[in-house]
């Protein structure tokens, strides 16, 4: 098996396994050699920190920000282990289209935890955490008497109050009427 050559350090690795390569790539000599390589490359191109963004142009900068993986690097979330453990510092983007990302809000007085700007609702409506019923279907039991809720005071006691579907109520009424009629017919027959 051929030995692994590192072009930044200009050496052949004695351990060319993936573990040996990883250890070499995380070493301080390799990192400093890589930094020096790219600094020399930028120096040869005539790129200085003052004209760096002008050299990239607005299109290149916008393309970097449109890539969600590059956003991790731009926000200072770069991790040296990203290549080998990509989910370690990955922050999921908010999928809410009305969400406004607060870039540079750390110096703003509105960014303090618990601070509510003037005129804002201190207790916003939240359907998940409040106790209001969202659906219009009635509760199966009354809160005060703990008895089943009825739509009419003349309903049969055998009706299933848990199912408020009109079709099933009609069917259950039909079944009860049928059972009651059979019961009456059986009792009306008297032996001679």
Swiss-Prot record:
Keywords: Metal-binding, Nucleus, Ribonucleoprotein, RNA-binding, Zinc, Zinc-finger
InterPro entries: Matrin/U1-C_Znf_C2H2, Matrin/U1-like-C_Znf_C2H2, U1-CZ_Znf_C2H2, U1_snRNP-C, Znf_C2H2_sf
Xref: Gene3D superfamilies: Classic Zinc Finger
Comp. bias regions, Low complexity: 164-173
A GO molecular-function descriptor: mRNA binding
Ranges of Polar residues composition bias in the record: 133-154, 174-192
Compartments where located: Nucleus
UniProt record, GO biological process: mRNA 5'-splice site recognition; spliceosomal snRNP assembly
PROSITE patterns from the UniProt entry: ZF_MATRIN
Zinc finger motifs (Matrin-type), residue ranges: 4-36
Region annotated Disordered, chain positions: 118-192
Entry GO CC: commitment complex; U1 snRNP; U2-type prespliceosome
Principal cellular location given in the protein's record: nucleus
Protein family per UniProt: Belongs to the U1 small nuclear ribonucleoprotein C family.
Function: Component of the spliceosomal U1 snRNP, which is essential for recognition of the pre-mRNA 5' splice-site and the subsequent assembly of the spliceosome. U1-C is directly involved in initial 5' splice-site recognition for both constitutive and regulated alternative splicing. The interaction with the 5' splice-site seems to precede base-pairing between the pre-mRNA and the U1 snRNA. Stimulates commitment or early (E) complex formation by stabilizing the base pairing of the 5' end of the U1 snRNA and the 5' splice-site region.
Assembly, per entry: U1 snRNP is composed of the 7 core Sm proteins B/B', D1, D2, D3, E, F and G that assemble in a heptameric protein ring on the Sm site of the small nuclear RNA to form the core snRNP, and at least 3 U1 snRNP-specific proteins U1-70K, U1-A and U1-C. U1-C interacts with U1 snRNA and the 5' splice-site region of the pre-mRNA.
PANTHER family given in the database record: U1 SMALL NUCLEAR RIBONUCLEOPROTEIN C
Protein name: U1 small nuclear ribonucleoprotein C
């Amino acid at each position: 098996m051929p030995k692994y050559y590192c072009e930044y350090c200009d050496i052949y690795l004695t351990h060319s396994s993936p573990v040996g390569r990883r250890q070499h790539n995380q070493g301080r000599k390799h990192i400093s050699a890589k930094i020096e390589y790219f600094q020399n490359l930028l120096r040869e191109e005539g790129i200085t920190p003052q004209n760096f963004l002008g050299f990239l142009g607005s299109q290149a900068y916008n393309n970097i920000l449109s890539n969600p993986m590059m956003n991790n690097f731009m926000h200072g979330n770069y991790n040296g282990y990203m290549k080998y453990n990509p989910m370690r510092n990955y922050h999921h983007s908010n999928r809410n289209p009305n969400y406004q990302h607060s870039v540079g809000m750390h110096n703003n007085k509105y960014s303090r935890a618990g601070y509510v700007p003037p005129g804002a609702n201190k207790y916003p409506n939240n359907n998940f955490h409040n106790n209001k019923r969202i659906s219009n279907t009635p509760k199966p039991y009354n809160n005060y008497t703990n008895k089943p809720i009825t739509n009419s005071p003349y309903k049969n006691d055998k009706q299933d109050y848990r199912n408020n579907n009109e079709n099933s109520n009609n069917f259950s009424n039909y079944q009860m009427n049928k059972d009651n009629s059979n019961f009456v017919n059986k009792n009306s027959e008297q032996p001679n």
